[in-house]
A protein has these predicted regions:
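Short, membrane-interfacial amphipathic segments enriched in basic
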Residues: 8-21
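Hydrophobic membrane-insertion alpha-helices, especially the h-region
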Residues: 31-51
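Short, well-ordered beta-strand elements
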Residues: 58-68, 94-97
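Solvent-exposed loop/turn segments at secondary-structure junctions
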Residues: 67-71, 137-141, 208-209
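Extracytoplasmic/periplasmic/luminal assembly and interaction segments
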Residues: 77-131
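Extracytoplasmic "Venus flytrap"/periplasmic binding protein-like
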Residues: 109, 115-173
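A bilobed periplasmic-binding-protein/Venus flytrap-type ligand-binding module shared by bacterial periplasmic
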Residues: 196-209
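Short amphipathic alpha-helical coupling segments at ligand-binding clamshell hinges
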Residues: 209-220
Length: 223
């Protein structure tokens, strides 16, 4: 039987069936073909998304740790104003990782807390994190492994003079007090985002791939 004859035979079979029987027949005899088509479409879609994603450039990546607003906060206005301040184009990304909550006391850390720790570790290890906005416990915890930049060394003189009264010092692994964070208590961060911390601090990660953008964020928050 030729392919044409076989196709005509299948058409006649389906023509004489009810809609329910047709659906059953097609699924029963062609399910592997259909699944293969769906799989191919899924793979092509994933590859296409990856290729398209590569046309974007991450300008800044921020992690917000221990926001106590219970989901009531939003970083949309912060992101929008940062994009404008930094002169971002349509394919420039500012990534703000929200919803990260962890109790750094090992005895009381929840599964969600461990998931947060794992995500932050992955971001740092892959050099995909520039700035942490967190409470005092987040700053203190990560500075024990010298995770943050020394702001007295990093900040340009003019910017340092502007923010020096807001510097927070945390102990590094050797017990030395290091100037690694800025208190954002007197900034408009809370008003713009609804973030609740007492107070929030900003620190720049040692391995930040976008230090200039991180400095621009500080300039934006301390006009």
């Amino acid at each position: 039987m030729s392919i044409r004859e076989e196709a005509e035979n299948e058409r006649q079979k389906l023509k004489n069936m009810s809609w329910k029987d047709r659906a059953w027949y097609v699924w029963e005899y062609y399910k592997f073909h259909l699944l293969a088509v769906i799989l191919v479409i899924g793979v092509l879609s994933t590859i296409g998304t990856m290729i398209y994603r590569q046309t974007f450039t991450t300008r800044l990546s921020v992690a917000i740790i221990n926001d106590r607003s219970a989901g009531a906060s939003s970083s949309a206005l912060l992101e929008s104003e940062l994009r404008e301040y930094m002169g971002c184009g349509k394919k420039d990304l500012i990534e703000i990782n929200e919803g990260l909550m962890v109790d750094f006391n090992e005895e009381s850390t929840s599964q969600y807390g461990y998931a947060t720790l794992a995500k932050i570790s992955a971001l740092v290890a892959s050099k995909s994190l520039d700035v942490v906005i967190g409470d005092q416990s987040a700053i203190d915890h990560y500075e024990t492994v010298s995770a943050y930049q020394n702001l007295e060394e990093l900040l340009p003189p003019e910017l340092y003079e502007r923010v020096k009264d807001h510097i927070y010092r945390a102990k590094d692994g050797e017990g030395n007090l290091m100037p690694v964070a800025l208190s954002l208590e007197d900034t408009a961060l809370g008003e713009k985002t609804g973030i609740i911390m007492d107070p929030p601090y900003l620190a720049i990660i040692q391995g930040s791939p976008h230090k200039e953008a991180a400095l621009q964020m500080i300039e934006y928050l301390f006009p």
